[in-house]
Amino acid sequence: MINASLKELSLALAAKKVSSVELSSLFLDRIERLNPTLNAFVTVDREKSLQMARDADARIAAGTAGPLTGIPIAQKDIFCAEGWLSTCGSKMLANFVSPYDATVIRKMHAEAGLVSLGKTNMDEFAMGSSNETSFFGSVRNPWDTQRVPGGSSGGSAAAVAARLAPAATGTDTGGSIRQPAALCNLTGLKPTYGVVSRYGMIAFASSLDQGGPMAASAEDCALLLNTMVGFDERDSTSLERPVEDYARDLDKPLDGLRIGLPKEFFGEGCDAEVMAAVRAAIAEYEKLGATCVEISLPNSHLSVPAYYVIAPAEASSNLSRFDGVRYGYRAPEYGNLDDMYMKTRAQGFGAEVKRRILIGAYVLSHGYYDAYYLQAQRIRRLIANDFVEAFKHCDVIMSPTSPSTAFKLGEKAADPVQMYLSDIYTIAVNLAGLPGMSIPCGFVGGLPVGLQLIGNYFAENRLLNVAHRYQQATDWHQRRPGGIE
């Protein structure tokens, strides 16, 4: 049961071969045993989870269950969940118990009947590429516990890779689902911006943030995505579109598929062995009936600098609400209101968050707004236009997800620029608002390599189909880390 797919678990629950309580207990026991090594979860509430499992069993017995009712999953601790600690990996919210459910949580609990096993560790306020900025300590990669799992959804990635949960939620602002998926041998999907509600998802950069699924396979991601999507009037950026069944087209053949290979993503800057694994995966696609065309994304080299103006600018605004007045951490000693603000924020935020708040405040300040922020927004439009032009010549774009395999804990902690370049292939997708995936495509030195798939707007079905057909022809996604038991 530990390695079963969501579809297999669904069939087992429906056939009464196992109960949700038994299944949830199995994973909760595994979390209790292995989480001290991995630090993937920051909050586990066994009784809450088992009560949800009992409710799910009642729905199954009554014949009112959905496809995933009773299946336990992990929730990234960026989603508010009523009655649960919702920390966002920060001292600022270390004791914050949410009074309400995020829309994604409500849809999963109340509508789909999924069971939450707990809240997973993450980079503080989702700011990081290695899960080393969390107030609750670094997460360790199950493939090598001396290495990072990627970030910011590193806790979710480590939890699923080590089978502490069969699937998990993540969020992606510049690569935070795809990069950990690549480093932990998972399938991760960032949907088109606006497809998944951001209500109750603690904001980092509101024009970039998007929630999505992380699991072993494309099929599992499709099933989980079905429970997450839908218009939400409480999110002003939510898109009102017909709800799709993302598992519908998984088995379609790939004959005639046109794969775009951006020349800018296949030059220097990527580890040679990682690139070899990516090229081998593309060759496998050609065997499945696809053809490759060279395309250009001429402004993609500007994506990292543009992102590190826009995202910190939005973060400096979003994080101004954390001031110690109504909720969250408050400095124990202060002289007056201004002193309370300063001490609370100085003590409550970690170094990387403070760095990005300072950058954001600077680029939005009088005299620098036009030179930095407006210029970054112009570049963002050019990057989006490049993708529009590219998709006239191809159906899906492929590239490495990350320029390297998982690096050692602490290796890049003192060099923010090197850390930021970990997301060099993923950031442009967020700036354009496109859907993107990472799927396992090989190993280098025993560490996983991810292949990035980028689709046109609302092409999640096509991406999942392309990923699924590759996973039917290969077994990379079925490999599990050893040595963590």
Curated annotation (Swiss-Prot):
Active-site positions on this chain: 76 (charge relay system), 152 (charge relay system), 176 (acyl-ester intermediate)
Matching InterPro entries: Amidase, Amidase_CS, Amidase_dom, AS_sf, GatA
The organism of origin for this protein: Dechloromonas aromatica (strain RCB)
Top-level class of the enzyme under EC nomenclature: ligase
EC code(s) of this entry: 6.3.5.7
Known partners and oligomeric status: Heterotrimer of A, B and C subunits.
Function summary: Allows the formation of correctly charged Gln-tRNA(Gln) through the transamidation of misacylated Glu-tRNA(Gln) in organisms which lack glutaminyl-tRNA synthetase. The reaction takes place in the presence of glutamine and ATP through an activated gamma-phospho-Glu-tRNA(Gln).
Name of this protein: Glutamyl-tRNA(Gln) amidotransferase subunit A
Classification via Gene3D superfamilies: Amidase signature (AS) domain (3.90.1300.10)
Reactions performed catalytically: L-glutamyl-tRNA(Gln) + L-glutamine + ATP + H2O = L-glutaminyl-tRNA(Gln) + L-glutamate + ADP + phosphate + H(+)
